Amino acid sequence: MSKYSQDVLQLLYKNKPNYISGQSIAESLNISRTAVKKVIDQLKLEGCKIDSVNHKGHLLQQLPDIWYQGIIDQYTKSSALFDFSEVYDSIDSTQLAAKKSLVGNQSSFFILSDEQTKGRGRFNKHWSSSKGQGLWMSVVLRPNVAFSMISKFNLFIALGIRDAIQHFSQDEVKVKWPNDIYIDNGKVCGFLTEMVANNDGIEAIICGIGINLTQQLENFDESIRHRATSVQLHDKNKLDRYQFLERLLQEIEKRYNQFLTLSFSEIREEYIAASNIWNRTLLFTENDKQFKGQAIDLDYDGYLIVRDEAGESHRLISADIDF
């Protein structure tokens, strides 16, 4: 990307849905109109859909499936929660990058990458993070809360992610307790919550989020094709990743504020209604111990109440669940 590409793109984005003249762009950036034209032409080659009309200017109609730092900066400038973001073309893991970036500052921020080469989920399971097909990010938040609140955070943030996906999906989106989001029988999202703590409590929550955005079925590995899906597969319109990210950040901010001010009991019924684990036999894995059973209830502290095949009850704060 050329020296002024991010700046030109930012001006085009800020002026949507209006045209902006090449002269206005040139004056804003203190460059020539010839330089502006070269940048516009290059952005078009990169996949930006820009309508250019004589005596009217340029209109950004659609962005390609690439993350641009200049556009993301617009979200953080208007956000009451996030102070900054870091955007990468490719990275080993957004979670690892977030842990490095939180050292020496007290900011809330997020890391976003177009590709992860070492993406992982809970229990260190591999998470496929292919280029241009998903939203791979880590969110760093700074709540002043006790260690025990981490499981409560999971419950609130799951609803935020679910709500963002539901906005774009024609089919019902459900939460699979505690860390997965499904559309129908396909997993569309997994998230991983970790914390950095000191003697006084939680210093930072780092929530890694992986959402399949635009994959077609053939893009998934054959071994998971029967149980994976993407948002695009349930959206009749072409999915705009920037609109999706904006909605996701709004929902995260909303649910994070609820997490800080509400008890889980106040959203318990909503969470139960949004869950897909009821009235079915499930395989539970807890601390390397496996058993089959049914989820009976979610108590007011967010623990899952399970009855196994022998009739014994279990109260789980975290476990891996397979259908």
PLM-predicted stretches and their roles:
Residues 2-31, 45-46, 146-149, 155-173, ...:
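Long, positively charged amphipathic alpha-helical accessory segments at protein N-termini or as interdomain linkers
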Residues 180:
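Conserved active-site carboxylates
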Residues 2-166, 239:
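N-terminal lobe of the biotin/lipoate ligase/transferase fold
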Residues 109, 171-176:
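A short coil-to-beta-strand element that immediately follows conserved catalytic motifs
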